[in-house]
Amino acid sequence: MYAWPASEVPALPGRGRDLRIHDTATGGPLTLDPGPVARIYVCGITPYDATHMGHAATYNAFDLVQRVWLDTKRQVHYVQNVTDIDDPLLERAVANGDDWTALAERETTLFREDMTALRMLPPRHYIGAVEAIPGIVPLVERLRDAGAAYELEGDIYFSVESDPSFGGVSGLDAEAMRLLSAERGGDPDRPGKKNPLDPMLWLAARPGEPSWDGGSLGRGRPGWHIECVAIALDHLGMGFDVQGGGSDLAFPHHEMGASHAQVLTGERPFAKAYVHAGMVALDGEKMSKSKGNLVFVSALRRDGVDPAAIRLALLAHHYREDWEWTDGVLQEAQERLARWRAAVSRPDGPPADALLDEIRTALANDLDAPSALAAVDRWASAQASEGGTDEGAPGLVSRAVDALLGVAL
């Protein structure tokens, strides 16, 4: 599977600061020191109802991670998956009278277009779950053969008790895990499971559903968590720098994935930091495909909204914050974009070296984009009220906003 084209990242003078970011597993800040090549895995979409504002907010957060790393003169090895086979996708295809493969391809194409418009830097590897199946099957077989997985009516389950550190990512107690498992794709009430929390590794073929050759597992398709594990291990290996996604992925998805990988390899951690973006609401409820309360990037673009304004609307909220999308949020972003563009269109202005430092400092501090935006606002206000004589300032501001915030002025 291919990703989307990369937008150019302008060069900036000097070097950015190392990123200090909130780690879900420890519950506190962690200063990342990735070495010359930073490694990040971000869980991708299930390709139906793409791209809603919750998606966009999540990928915006991890785009900032990439930009901060690039500003420290590091290379970034970014991997993202596409969950192009899953129960919700199949259910939507049936409900729409659509072919599931056509639905997945159409929505993935739309997602790429939205990411391009929003100037999200693409992953180096963009991998669909279906194309990863040949690498998934041997991992499930290894877990089964090691006694870390078991069969139940043809399905293969992972035993969470095989990982002594299970629970270390989310920090939840067993009852909270059970409730979230039921809400988020698990089957804690299925009779015969060794532990209600045990997740599916391999779903045996069902009549009328797609299936693939699973070797000694029989025909079927993979469970959700093992898909990301297989892709991450193949392209990044153990101990990569950041595992990212929305906060609703901390459990069960990232918890289970960490256990799968750690039992498979005998090493830990799977990722050095688990980083989660907040949820975006509409009319007081979390934006979700199941509820249908969605605002789509593509719909806003069709209505003539500048993608740069959409991105500024996302940046106005700290990535870990839960917030609500409103018309007012978008209007404020559009007005900010107009002020910034007017400010950088002038031939000179107030010196901007300090502004570049402020943006870098804000983003290095747990991706504090709102503080970065406030710094640019102050420069733009000074430009509007007093002006300046630094001929290089408008260009530096424009390049800094593009390189570090992903907004083209």
Swiss-Prot record:
<dbReference type="GO" id="GO:0005829">
    <property type="term" value="C:cytosol"/>
</dbReference>
<keyword id="KW-0862">Zinc</keyword>
<dbReference type="InterPro" id="IPR014729">
    <property type="entry name" value="Rossmann-like_a/b/a_fold"/>
</dbReference>
<keyword id="KW-0479">Metal-binding</keyword>
<comment type="function">
    <text>Catalyzes the ATP-dependent condensation of GlcN-Ins and L-cysteine to form L-Cys-GlcN-Ins.</text>
</comment>
<keyword id="KW-0436">Ligase</keyword>
<feature type="binding site">
    <location>
        <begin position="81"/>
        <end position="83"/>
    </location>
    <ligand>
        <name>L-cysteinyl-5'-AMP</name>
    </ligand>
</feature>
<feature type="short sequence motif" description="'ERGGDP' region">
    <location>
        <begin position="183"/>
        <end position="188"/>
    </location>
</feature>
<feature type="binding site">
    <location>
        <position position="224"/>
    </location>
    <ligand>
        <name>L-cysteinyl-5'-AMP</name>
    </ligand>
</feature>
<feature type="binding site">
    <location>
        <position position="280"/>
    </location>
    <ligand>
        <name>L-cysteinyl-5'-AMP</name>
    </ligand>
</feature>
<feature type="short sequence motif" description="'KMSKS' region">
    <location>
        <begin position="286"/>
        <end position="290"/>
    </location>
</feature>
<dbReference type="InterPro" id="IPR032678">
    <property type="entry name" value="tRNA-synt_1_cat_dom"/>
</dbReference>
<dbReference type="Pfam" id="PF01406">
    <property type="entry name" value="tRNA-synt_1e"/>
</dbReference>
<dbReference type="GO" id="GO:0005524">
    <property type="term" value="F:ATP binding"/>
</dbReference>
<feature type="binding site">
    <location>
        <begin position="246"/>
        <end position="248"/>
    </location>
    <ligand>
        <name>L-cysteinyl-5'-AMP</name>
    </ligand>
</feature>
<dbReference type="GO" id="GO:0010125">
    <property type="term" value="P:mycothiol biosynthetic process"/>
</dbReference>
<feature type="binding site">
    <location>
        <position position="228"/>
    </location>
    <ligand>
        <name>Zn(2+)</name>
    </ligand>
</feature>
<keyword id="KW-0547">Nucleotide-binding</keyword>
<feature type="binding site">
    <location>
        <position position="43"/>
    </location>
    <ligand>
        <name>Zn(2+)</name>
    </ligand>
</feature>
<dbReference type="InterPro" id="IPR017812">
    <property type="entry name" value="Mycothiol_ligase_MshC"/>
</dbReference>
<feature type="binding site">
    <location>
        <begin position="43"/>
        <end position="46"/>
    </location>
    <ligand>
        <name>L-cysteinyl-5'-AMP</name>
    </ligand>
</feature>
<keyword id="KW-0067">ATP-binding</keyword>
<comment type="subunit">
    <text>Monomer.</text>
</comment>
<dbReference type="GO" id="GO:0004817">
    <property type="term" value="F:cysteine-tRNA ligase activity"/>
</dbReference>
<feature type="short sequence motif" description="'HIGH' region">
    <location>
        <begin position="45"/>
        <end position="55"/>
    </location>
</feature>
<feature type="binding site">
    <location>
        <position position="58"/>
    </location>
    <ligand>
        <name>L-cysteinyl-5'-AMP</name>
    </ligand>
</feature>
<protein>
    <recommendedName>
        <fullName>L-cysteine:1D-myo-inositol 2-amino-2-deoxy-alpha-D-glucopyranoside ligase</fullName>
        <ecNumber>6.3.1.13</ecNumber>
    </recommendedName>
</protein>
<feature type="binding site">
    <location>
        <position position="253"/>
    </location>
    <ligand>
        <name>Zn(2+)</name>
    </ligand>
</feature>
<dbReference type="GO" id="GO:0035446">
    <property type="term" value="F:cysteine-glucosaminylinositol ligase activity"/>
</dbReference>
<dbReference type="GO" id="GO:0008270">
    <property type="term" value="F:zinc ion binding"/>
</dbReference>
<dbReference type="GO" id="GO:0006423">
    <property type="term" value="P:cysteinyl-tRNA aminoacylation"/>
</dbReference>
<comment type="similarity">
    <text>Belongs to the class-I aminoacyl-tRNA synthetase family. MshC subfamily.</text>
</comment>
<dbReference type="InterPro" id="IPR024909">
    <property type="entry name" value="Cys-tRNA/MSH_ligase"/>
</dbReference>
